[in-house]
Amino acid sequence: MSERDEEPANPAPGTRRPGGRTARTRAAVRDAVLSGLADHGYPGLTVEYVADHSGVHKTTLYRRWGGLEGMVADALDMAGEDTWTPPDTGSLEGDLRELAREVVDSFSDEAASSAPTAFVAAAFQSQRAADALHAFYAERFGRCETVVARAVARGEAPPDTDAAALVRAVSAPLLLRVFITREPVDAALADQSAAAAVAATRGGAFARR
């Protein structure tokens, strides 16, 4: 690998600098990290692998990201920079059903599930990855505030409903099967999880405390 892939700047590990060559470098590293996590998991991911598959020199990787933890954390940061918005079906149960089915879609296909599964595994082995995963989902839960706001306006949920607690409750039965009992998940289970969460919401189970 040539030194041409090094960048002259010296930002802190994982620092975001938009545009041009830096953006391309960051995307290339992200893609290599995702590929490595999918193929080898966090324990098998190496700086050498990322360098070989991204075309970015090891010196640059260490200087900008500080090591593997920084690269994995930044890949999660980039995942949170998307334009995803929660569904708007016209009802709380419909919105939660769609959210639950997104979880099913993310983890029921082997190819699609490899990266998110590896991110979760990495969070058990790296505090920095765990912090990044927490931040990713906290931001996702924040976007789901609109689901609850619409439900409150329609009279489907109490005004003090905690959106994050509600979304966790919808996802929890699905993720239990994916990561703990290793059972399959499907649309029927997603719909069941949504219906249960709606019933609990109406009973005030997710009131902010």
Indicate residue ranges for each PLM-predicted region.
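Amphipathic alpha-helical interaction segments
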Residues: 28, 70, 94, 98, ...
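Short amphipathic alpha-helical segment with a characteristic S/N-K-E followed by hydrophobic residues
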Residues: 29, 44, 67-72, 82-83, ...
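Solvent-exposed, amphipathic alpha-helical segments
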Residues: 28, 32-40, 95, 102, ...
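Hydrophobic alpha-helical connector segments
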Residues: 84-113, 166
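Basic, helix-initiating cap at the start of DNA-binding domains
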Residues: 1-53, 59, 70
